[in-house]
């Protein structure tokens, strides 16, 4: 979305670092460490001096040049703007100039309401201007209602009815929009759920009731990003943290087994990383496997996810006859001949497979396990590894 050159205002001789925002997930940790080498990148302070900006799709961001910002604020802003379409970027650019904003925290606030303004950059097509303005003001409408709308008349009413502010991006009409503080300068606001996100959580100090004093984390992510979110939320250690699910791409059977309230944030992150390349059918299969194996925590489910190929799954199969039919016609284990259809005894073969596989029917179909370990052994996590994770997650004395 944009590139910013960041440096320390008090130690400019240390040099500057060019950072692309939003920071690619796989580069986040290295970027933070590189910023720390320049004595910037603090989790809470606005200690990054923006030396220059390159933002071809959002030139209004150049107004941040020379200002101070927090690295995670810039990362959040880059991610938010990445979700904007072409006209929404036009609205944002024009609104930045209209309201004379330049600081990253101000632009975060604006990103929540910039879509409320109407920007007219071409007065030659008043029909389009009017219909677009109508959609902005009303949010949505029936397609027939929009088709029957006199766009030109609506545009003329807009132009004559409220003052317009000329910017290099077009004429801005506020539509009564008020710029309000959505970001409290401590806790980053929630943001759209990324495509690669599997689980979104709200984290806060146990017993904290103020909804503003919490952080949103999207898993999987880097450990350092989780630790920084904990610090922003004032969470000193995992034992002082309360987690709530905000959104999930896991099937219900997995969500029910997670026990997020008493689980480990870092185990949940490991689970999501294990599922990062899953397709829709893999998630469905994992849900069926969870119903069969009955895991009790994220570590158990991660072991199942990492060993999913040791399970066979027949979706939407709930009777021995359906199982027999699936195995013969769809599993690929046999050459099915439709001319012999009347000779197949699907029910008997289904019963035989169930007894042979020790399989079970669950909500989403039939599942069986063919590994060499018992299910309990398969799900058993390495206790030494879990202990190390918890030790690394202790935040006391951590410096950024």
Question: What spans do the regions from the language model cover?
Answer:
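Short, surface-exposed beta-strand/loop "edge" segments at domain boundaries and coil↔beta transitions
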Residues: 11-15, 57-59, 180-181, 208-214, ...
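Structured domain cores in non-transmembrane regions
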Residues: 30-102, 224-296
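Non-Sec secretion/translocation targeting segments of pathogen effectors
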Residues: 150, 345, 385-400
């Amino acid at each position: 979305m944009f590139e910013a050159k960041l440096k320390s205002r008090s130690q400019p001789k240390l040099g500057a670092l060019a950072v692309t925002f939003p920071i690619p997930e796989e580069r986040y940790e290295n970027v933070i460490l590189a910023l720390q080498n320049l004595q910037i990148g603090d989790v809470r302070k606005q200690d990054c001096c923006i030396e220059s900006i390159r933002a071809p799709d959002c030139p209004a961001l150049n107004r941040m040049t020379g200002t101070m910002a927090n690295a995670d604020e810039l990362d959040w802003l880059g991610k938010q703007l990445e979700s904007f379409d072409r006209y929404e970027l036009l609205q944002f650019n024009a609104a930045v100039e209209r309201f004379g904003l330049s600081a990253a925290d101000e632009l975060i606030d604006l990103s929540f309401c910039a879509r409320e303004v109407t920007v007219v950059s071409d007065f030659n097509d008043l029909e389009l201007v009017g219909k677009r303005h109508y959609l902005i003001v009303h949010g949505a409408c029936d397609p027939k209602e929009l088709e029957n709308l006199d766009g030109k008349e609506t545009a003329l009413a807009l132009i004559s009815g409220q003052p317009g502010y000329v910017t290099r991006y077009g004429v801005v009409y506020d539509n009564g929009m008020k710029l309000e503080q959505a970001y409290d300068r401590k806790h980053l606001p929630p943001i759209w759920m990324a495509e690669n996100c599997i689980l979104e959580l709200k984290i806060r100090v146990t017993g904290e009731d103020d909804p503003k004093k919490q952080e949103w984390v999207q898993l999987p992510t880097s450990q350092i990003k989780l630790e920084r979110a904990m610090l922003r939320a004032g969470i000193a250690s995992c034992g002082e943290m309360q987690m709530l699910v905000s959104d999930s791409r896991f099937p219900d059977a997995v969500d029910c087994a997670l026990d997020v309230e008493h689980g480990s944030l870092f185990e949940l992150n490991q689970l999501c990383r294990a599922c990062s390349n899953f397709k829709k059918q893999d998630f469905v299969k994992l849900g069926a496997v969870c119903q069969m194996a009955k895991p009790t925590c994220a570590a158990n489910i991660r072991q199942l996810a990492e060993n999913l190929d040791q399970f066979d799954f027949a979706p939407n199969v709930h009777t021995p006859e359906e199982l027999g039919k699936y195995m013969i016609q769809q599993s690929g284990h046999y050459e099915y001949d439709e001319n012999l259809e009347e000779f197949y005894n699907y029910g008997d073969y289904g019963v035989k497979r169930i007894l042979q596989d020790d399989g079970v029917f669950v909500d989403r179909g039939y599942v069986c396990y063919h590994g060499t370990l018992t299910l309990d052994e398969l799900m058993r996590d390495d206790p030494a590894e879990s202990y190390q994770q918890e030790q690394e997650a202790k935040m006391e004395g951590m410096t950024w």
